[in-house]
UniProtKB/Swiss-Prot annotation:
InterPro entries for the chain: Hyethyz_kinase, Ribokinase-like
Cofactor: Mg(2+)
Protein family membership: Belongs to the Thz kinase family.
Lineage: Bacteria, Bacillati, Bacillota, Bacilli, Bacillales
Binding site for substrate: M42, G191
GO annotation, biological process: thiamine biosynthetic process; thiamine diphosphate biosynthetic process
Pfam families in the record: HK
Keyword Transferase: yes
The protein's name in its UniProt record: Hydroxyethylthiazole kinase
Pathway: Cofactor biosynthesis; thiamine diphosphate biosynthesis; 4-methyl-5-(2-phosphoethyl)-thiazole from 5-(2-hydroxyethyl)-4-methylthiazole: step 1/1
Function: Catalyzes the phosphorylation of the hydroxyl group of 4-methyl-5-beta-hydroxyethylthiazole (THZ).
Natural source organism: Listeria monocytogenes serotype 4a (strain HCC23)
Gene name as annotated: thiM
EC number(s) from the headed UniProt entry: 2.7.1.50
Length: 269
């Protein structure tokens, strides 16, 4: 099922990815999107959200650094994107960390139909209402079954769920996939998950099947990180970051096919 041709479609079409994102990761996300062949726009003024919804091929909402004006812009953009038929991706950064973040995400979910939600296990557990010990914006620890969390959120919100971790879990509520790739250095650079959300958005923009797009995005991204690590003389995050950007720019279908470890199933048992 997964031929990774979505990657080639991203390069051919250069989708316009509208990011309402946080101040920590904006630069890295923009450069990462450029590396894979997408076209990023990092805009958050509420006055231009309606126009951008008609221009963009996908909207990616990231709640990493919130304020009231930004939340209002997110809501306007999300509603306008829904009207325009533009897919919308949510990255609920640290949703379990504070009551304000939980409130904002609840409001966004109530007002916007999201095509996909990508986060770590702690973030998706918070959305699912499952017990989990969050550690700020990091995944933290919990005993809930990650596949069950993905299934619950996907079905409740009619969306594709991407739970990032040592093994990524992707589900649309009826289909499930695990991606067992990725460099151990990815969690050591800030914004690697946020960039993955944007990359998933760019794949979804050019592929009608959001589940397939998300699986291929996760696998391609993780495999690129493994190739980047192979180029390192010393396994340090500062050296890894630019090599990872180069690996994203030199992605190929053949490279991804050669290393991707995907396990797919039709149902969660």
């Amino acid at each position: 099922m997964f031929d990774f041709m979505t990657l080639e479609k991203v390069r051919e079409k250069g989708p316009l990815v509208h990011n309402i994102t946080n101040i920590v990761v904006a630069n890295d996300s923009a450069n990462g999107l450029l590396a894979i062949g997408a076209s990023p726009i990092m805009a958050s003024a509420k006055e231009e959200m309606d126009e951008l919804a008609k221009m963009a091929d996908v909207l990616v909402i990231n709640i990493g650094t919130l304020d009231g004006e930004l939340v209002e812009a997110m809501k306007i953009a999300g509603r306008a994107a829904n009207v325009a038929g533009t897919p919308v991706v949510l990255d609920p950064v640290g949703v379990g960390a504070t009551s304000y973040r939980r409130k904002v995400v609840q409001e966004l979910l109530a007002e916007i139909q999201f095509t996909a939600i990508r986060g770590n296990a702690g973030e998706l557990a918070a959305i699912a209402g499952e017990a989990w010990e969050a550690k700020g914006v990091d995944a933290g620890v919990g005993s809930a079954d990650v596949l069950s969390i993905a299934e619950k959120v996907a079905n409740e919100w009619s969306t594709v769920v991407i739970i990032s971790g040592e093994v990524d879990v992707i589900s649309d509520g009826t289909r499930f996939a695990k991606v067992a790739n990725g460099s151990a250095l990815l969690p050591r650079i800030t914004g690697s998950g946020c960039l993955l959300s944007a990359v998933c958005g760019s794949f979804i923009a050019v592929q009608d099947d959001a589940f397939r797009a998300s699986v291929e995005a996760c696998a391609s991204y993780a495999v690129a990180s493994e190739y980047a690590e192979l180029e390192l003389e010393r396994k340090l995050p500062g050296s890894f970051r630019p090599l990872f950007l180069d690996a994203l720019a030199s992605w190929s279908v053949e490279k991804t096919h050669a290393k991707a470890k995907i396990q797919e199933s039709g149902e969660h048992k």
